[in-house]
Amino acid sequence: MITDFEDFCTWVFVVVDDTLSQIAPLVKRPGPKPQCTDSELIAMCLIGECRGWHMETELLSCWKEYQHLFPNIPSQSRFNRRRRNLMQAMNLIRIVLLRSLDLSQDRQCLIDSLPIPVVQFHLVPSSSGDWQAFQAIFGKAITKKQTFFGYRLHLLVTLSGVILDFELTPANSSDLEAGFELLSEHTDLEVLGDKAYISAAIAAELWEKNRIALRTVPRANQKQQVSETFKHLHNTIRQLIETVNGQLAGQFAIEKNFAHSFWGLCTRLYSKLTAHTLCIYLNRLLGKQDFLQIKALAFPN
């Protein structure tokens, strides 16, 4: 049971340390052991994501108030460098936890995307980052009726709210094309998508090659329609992915970029997505029925 913030920190560290020991041969790096271990640094990152400490200056400053938990806090430059070097380890931790979750075995999923802006619109011409070298471009955030510069994050989420897979693409990429690429890595799924994923040809190919049933509500001008009951059920279920997107945009501030480079952005995305999976994993360990209530873990009463 997690009764306070220090309990939460202990649980996160133990899970991270145990999982990292399982994948140690894959992430082993040369050189002497640092005072702040990899497990400690990753735990600090993931806990910081859950608490909303998204800027490194804020993160390190906040951890100084809890130095009895993590006594060997690196300097900001060293912390930043080691965090980038450990981003693949963080993603492997996410994958290991995901595979051990019973919820990840759900064969019914949702697919959607959300904008990942990297530079404010008016600052793009003077930006000194490497964004354009890594295909950052202008795109439209339809729901917000805004143009942004950056990428889109495409998510495959189970009906229980677990992020099964993801893909980062340029901001102007088609949801349908990116979704097809993402789903092509999976088999035997039933996937609900919005109208951006309507394509009889793509749906047929996914079914034939991957046994994936891609289901969408047809546009009003299409001949073949579905019942109002199906439309209502479809829209009700799809609200779940809005919940997950809301968690990522709210608690994890995934649409706010504090990175100055593409690899810095990737590091932060891995950190946020791993933290989300970890929170669901902890809730399952604790036997909580409402396992999507993840904010309460980092802010216990």
Describe the function of each predicted region.
Residues 1-301:
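Short alpha-helical elements
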